[in-house]
Amino acid sequence: MPRRLCALLLLASQCLGSTAGLFPFGEPDFSYKRSNCKPIPAPMLLCRGIEYQSMRLPNLLGHETVQEVLEQATTWIPLVQKQCHPDTRKFLCSLFAPVCIDDLDEIIQPCHSLCEEVKESCAPVMSAFGFPWPDMLDCSRFPKDNDLCIPLASSDHILPVTREAPKVCDACKNKNEDDNDIMENLCKNDFALKIKVKEIAYINGDTKITPETKSKTIYKLNGLTERDLRKIVLWLKGGLQCTCDEMNDINVPYLVMGQKQAGELVITSLKRWQKGQRAFKRFSRSIRKLQC
């Protein structure tokens, strides 16, 4: 365990007092949750191998059960794997699995500088995948470094992050297609849908996209029925290792095309639906007459 963190935890064990101002998402009732320390579960990959073994519940994000923490923490693993900052995991674990000391009522938050450093490096990565830096990670909530908090790692003990130009997902590359190109591409694929995104997840390095069921338009569909579409799932293969600037706003509709591969609908082309754009207007009109 790093010396600074050891000293921090030793100091924390001696600092009993009010929790006012230290729990930004609502002050917990420690009259009955005083010793609610739980072992960090083995399946919690986000915080596996962190410098401490016990976490406090409720955590800094308001999660009250281990199961809830496991479910929510999993969604942040891709950000850690992007290696946007050396302390990303430390910062996230200080929120999802804050260090717990039996004799301490105070919850130990990440320092303001830790949050700011991680945000500066990782917010652009999140934005590239269509996610803004969330309000729940607002750095102004966290204490200055001269208070009791989890600090940024010393620059003497970390290696600089290598920042390579991110690879663009093949399906998201700007090909400057006109309406004829789009129509030709449709004929090469098994499906073409206009969708709005309900949920994005990452599984085994691939991006799983779940569309809104009530906001999709079907232009082409081979091998699937309307019943199948009620639980439709689209896949962007290798999505964890590439960026897709086309999806930097998941609140807008998209035109997605792709092929059925091994029972999965794999996206080969993804474009933001530009309302009023000539190519998309012609596409909507021409699709009814199309004969591939």
Curated annotation (Swiss-Prot):
Q: Note the CDD domains from the entry.
A: CRD_SFRP2, NTR_Sfrp1_like
Per UniProt, what is one GO molecular function of this protein?
A: Wnt-protein binding
Disulfide pairs? C37-C100, C47-C93, C84-C122, C111-C149, C115-C139, C169-C242, C187-C292
- Name the major location: secreted
BP GO annotations: apoptotic process; canonical Wnt signaling pathway; cell differentiation; non-canonical Wnt signaling pathway
The keyword Secreted is assigned to this record: yes
Q: Where is the NTR domain?
A: 169-292
- Enumerate the Pfam families for this protein: Fz, NTR
> What sections of the sequence does the record tag as coiled-coil?
none
Gene Ontology CC, one term: extracellular space
Job of this protein: Soluble frizzled-related proteins (sFRPS) function as modulators of Wnt signaling through direct interaction with Wnts. They have a role in regulating cell growth and differentiation in specific cell types. SFRP2 appears to be associated with myogenesis.
Q: What is known of its domains?
A: The FZ domain is involved in binding with Wnt ligands.
Q: What protein name applies here?
A: Secreted frizzled-related protein 2
| Source organism of this protein record | Gallus gallus
